[in-house]
Amino acid sequence: MSLIECKNINRCFGSGENRVHILKDISLSIEKGDFVAIIGQSGSGKSTLMNILGCLDTAGSGSYRIDGIETAKMQPDELAALRRERFGFIFQRYNLLSSLTARDNVALPAVYMGMGGKERSARADKLLQDLGLASKEGNKPGELSGGQQQRVSIARALMNGGEIIFADEPTGALDTASGKNVMEIIRRLHEAGHTVIMVTHDPGIAANANRVIEIRDGEIISDTSKNPEIPASNVGRIREKASWSFYYDQFVEAFRMSVQAVLAHKMRSLLTMLGIIIGIASVVSVVALGNGSQKKILEDISSMGTNTISIFPGRGFGDRRSGKIKTLTIDDAKIIAKQSYVASATPMTSSGGTLTYRNTDLTASLYGVGEQYFDVRGLKLETGRLFDENDVKEDAQVVVIDQNVKDKLFADSDPLGKTILFRKRPLTVIGVMKKDENAFGNSDVLMLWSPYTTVMHQITGESHTNSITVKIKDNANTRVAEKGLAELLKARHGTEDFFMNNSDSIRQMVESTTGTMKLLISSIALISLVVGGIGVMNIMLVSVTERTKEIGIRMAIGARRGNILQQFLIEAVLICIIGGLVGVGLSAAVSLVFNHFVTDFPMDISAASVIGAVACSTGIGIAFGFMPANKAAKLNPIDALAQD
């Protein structure tokens, strides 16, 4: 069985009136270890035939078999495997990647074979040394002469074994001396057992082969052999290694090429990233503002008491009849405090009036509360003490004042132990509260706190309370507790003449509202991300067009479609991730400036928003980079190689 066997191969280009029949019923067979020269003038079809034999192109009709296997039935990746494992190409124009060194160009086919990095470099250096380029491993193609570049191309063809060498006009771009040197190398390869198929228009070059096939106008007109003896082929084939390093090395290579592509066009890459940068910075900043404002509001709510339920007379805030309802009593508070899910219950009554100290009269509000009130409301003592259970039982004439009262009446003295008059009733100051920075409402109001028994019995003379503040135990559900309290009070009062304000409900409402606002504004900011993604897609399409030749070279040496897809997809994702990280950094800088000048609430950048931003930019890279990458992966190798 012949190594290569073609029967009735036809290839046409164009369609309709422009249809050109390049190859016409070509039939031939090539044995293992043969040295065949295909000769003909320009346009004769010799290069087209070699491209079909090298699986860079496909025949329009006919049969082409390698070791008896029909190539027409092979998938693109199966054809890539043939090029990778059995073929080696020597091109007239060398087709080296200008961004890689001689060593890296030679080693590139082995990347797609899964060969380890050290083994790959050692083999590449050995091949370069054998071809007289031992001192040129680190040189890039632009630093080498034409003859040296062609020898690098030959070394690359041998990297994976090169059982079958395809040489397309190997001396066409070389001077006479370099051409002779290259032909001597090719003859030695044949003598070593490689099957060599060479295309040339020069009869003198063709004379080096054992067999010469002449083509004219797409047809074989002669097939002569001058030496029927074919040396035994002992060329070892390097097998693909499917290990973790196989995938790792291919990813590293794709990543390295992506970085080089990004750095090669710095300004273009920066402008491409700009949409991503603005979009990510906008989203992260909006979320940070939302987090900061939500945190501030929730802190304010917490200052009013956590896990608390406040009970008021009436049907709701603004109920005009609430002042006439006097059914909320101290006994209600005592019964509520005994419930299993209640930590404490403190009644509250209030009174407005004139506060007098020496010759100063001020308008203030006095609140009658229980000893637990301050803990429930999260109020902190600055100096002195709070009243206790005994003070409540004994109707003690003591009072705790806020910072506003202290500043107005005791700016230059210690208020503790001083007696003040409220509605002409003497009260002894026993404590001063810290200023409540998180409190709602007017911060200039003068506030006093005394035992509710003192206020009710000695000042207002009323037996009912304005409200009851209930602290729910940490392990209890506030909604269930609210329902239980409602049933308890309805049973006591015989009607629902009260309403409740659950701090947990307020918290949930704030979280829901701020979450909705963040989502709304983030959705607007996401538009710039979509615009940025379109920019990435556009620039990647340009990149594919610019690097079509590179894609063709990689396919010729055995890259799968997946390898090409991976490389360009990584490039798109890399641009987006860098843009995302810069966007996060920009948002962090804005946050620092904002927090320096604005003290009402901070910009709070969370780890979740940063992770989400990077994930979002990665997703955009994948989504908008897939189409250009897929376009690159589906290019026909010979069409890609034909691009300049």
Swiss-Prot record:
Q: Which residues form the ABC transporter domain?
A: 4-242
Q: Where are the transmembrane segments?
A: 270-290, 524-544, 574-594, 607-627
Q: Which Gene3D superfamilies match?
A: P-loop containing nucleotide triphosphate hydrolases
Q: What SMART domains has UniProt attached to this entry?
A: AAA
| Keywords, sorted A to Z | Antibiotic resistance, ATP-binding, Cell inner membrane, Cell membrane, Membrane, Nucleotide-binding, Translocase, Transmembrane, Transmembrane helix, Transport
| Pfam families associated with the record | ABC_tran, FtsX, MacB_PCD
Q: How is this protein situated with respect to the membrane?
A: Multi-pass membrane protein
| Location in the cell | Cell inner membrane
MF term (GO), any: ATP hydrolysis activity
Per the record, what is one GO cellular component?
plasma membrane
Predominantly, its location class is: membrane
List of residues binding ATP: 40-47
**GO BP, sorted A to Z:** response to antibiotic
According to its UniProt entry, what is the function of this protein?
Non-canonical ABC transporter that contains transmembrane domains (TMD), which form a pore in the inner membrane, and an ATP-binding domain (NBD), which is responsible for energy generation. Confers resistance against macrolides.
Q: How does it assemble?
A: Homodimer.
Q: Belongs to which family?
A: Belongs to the ABC transporter superfamily. Macrolide exporter (TC 3.A.1.122) family.
Q: Report what the protein is called.
A: Macrolide export ATP-binding/permease protein MacB
